[in-house]
């Protein structure tokens, strides 16, 4: 019995050591990955053009995978800006007087025509449903629609991420099938990532985004 108990203790100790080693390795890998991404970001030059040849799904994939942007919903905003510049959506500013005579500005989006790219068509379809019969998307309407139909937006975001990964892989962006580390990227893949990071650096350093009107989206044009 004593020998059996000792054996169980030894086995338990070995298993515990193994678990600790695996946890330490995982933490070390995450830290190394984040350090490599941070170093790559710091070395990226400013980029003022539309990244990745205008393929927003690739930009979305790179931004999400390499910690350039944490909010998936940023893709929705970028697509809406793109459709505004193409004349598919017309932003209309309204000013109303609220309580105590305080004026309030709001921006409504008038849906004009269907866009030409697949991902924009998918979002435009969602916007049409959210806007209702008048074809004008008012503040909070998209938010309310997404709350009632969460799959409509989540599916669009997931499909965009998957498509972006597939397109990036087809364009020889990875050294292998896929990856989440800088070392998993080819020279071409690193160039594509540098464009996304460079645009973010430019916008953060030189653009007061919070002060821009929606009509000032010319920077997103080709």
Say what each PLM segment does:
Residues 1-222:
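Acidic, Ser/Thr/Pro-rich intrinsically disordered cytosolic tails and loops
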């Amino acid at each position: 019995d004593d020998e059996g108990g000792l054996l169980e203790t030894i086995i338990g100790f070995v298993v515990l050591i193994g678990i600790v080693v695996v946890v330490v390795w995982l933490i070390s890998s995450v830290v190394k990955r984040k350090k490599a991404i941070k170093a790559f970001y710091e070395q990226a030059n400013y980029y003022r053009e539309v990244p990745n040849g205008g393929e927003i799904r690739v930009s979305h994939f790179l931004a999400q995978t390499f910690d350039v942007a944490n909010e998936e919903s940023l893709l929705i905003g970028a697509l809406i800006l793109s459709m505004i510049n193409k004349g598919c959506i017309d932003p209309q500013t309204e000013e109303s007087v609220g309580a105590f005579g305080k004026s309030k500005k709001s921006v409504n989006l008038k849906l004009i025509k269907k866009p030409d790219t697949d991902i924009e068509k998918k979002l435009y379809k969602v916007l049409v449903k959210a806007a209702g019969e008048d074809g004008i998307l008012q503040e909070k309407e998209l938010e309310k629609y997404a709350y009632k139909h969460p799959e409509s937006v989540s599916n669009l975001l997931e499909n965009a991420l998957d498509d972006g990964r597939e397109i990036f892989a087809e364009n020889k962006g990875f050294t292998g099938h896929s990856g989440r580390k800088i070392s998993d990227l080819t020279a071409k893949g690193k160039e594509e990532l540098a464009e996304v990071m460079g645009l973010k650096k430019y916008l953060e350093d030189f653009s007061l985004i919070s002060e821009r009107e929606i009509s000032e989206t010319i920077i997103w044009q080709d």
